[in-house]
């Protein structure tokens, strides 16, 4: 049996992080967590691209453009969508989630969903490092693992195909 999986070695990986300015109290902490995770695991500053955008909906356009560039090993999208009194929360949360899923099905570059969807600001802050760990850090770990998995899948599938299996 062959088991293929990624690891947490970030050396040489190029990672983009897309982060909105909206809800900056939360998203800045998510970004800090993501950058901490990437750097702790060997991703160098020169291989990290941070793209600041106005809000979470703008991530869809930005992700498409980053995918078109085809220079990153993985892309992290961060954000904080906090429920309010209108339907806007549902629209934003659903559309960004659907877009990330669609891009992951149709592109070769893994996109990691690090967008918080919470009922309250307190819940968002807790998930951005106050109590429940930092989801930005967790997204960085997933990005490194998936970037390495992508490389291994390419290598192992290519080697298998080359050997006639």
Curated annotation (Swiss-Prot):
It comes from the Bacteria. 5-amino-6-(D-ribitylamino)uracil binds at residues 22, 56-58, 80-82, 113. Its EC number is 2.5.1.78. GO terms for molecular function: 6,7-dimethyl-8-ribityllumazine synthase activity. Keywords: Riboflavin biosynthesis, Transferase. The active site is at 88 (proton donor). GO terms for cellular component: cytosol; riboflavin synthase complex. (2S)-2-hydroxy-3-oxobutyl phosphate binds at residues 85-86, 127. One of its GO terms (biological process) is riboflavin biosynthetic process. Transmembrane segments: none annotated. Pathway: Cofactor biosynthesis; riboflavin biosynthesis; riboflavin from 2-hydroxy-3-oxobutyl phosphate and 5-amino-6-(D-ribitylamino)uracil: step 1/2. It catalyses: (2S)-2-hydroxy-3-oxobutyl phosphate + 5-amino-6-(D-ribitylamino)uracil = 6,7-dimethyl-8-(1-D-ribityl)lumazine + phosphate + 2 H2O + H(+). Belongs to the DMRL synthase family. Catalyzes the formation of 6,7-dimethyl-8-ribityllumazine by condensation of 5-amino-6-(D-ribitylamino)uracil with 3,4-dihydroxy-2-butanone 4-phosphate. This is the penultimate step in the biosynthesis of riboflavin. NCBIfam families: lumazine-synth. This is 6,7-dimethyl-8-ribityllumazine synthase. It comes from Thermotoga petrophila (strain ATCC BAA-488 / DSM 13995 / JCM 10881 / RKU-1). The gene is ribH.
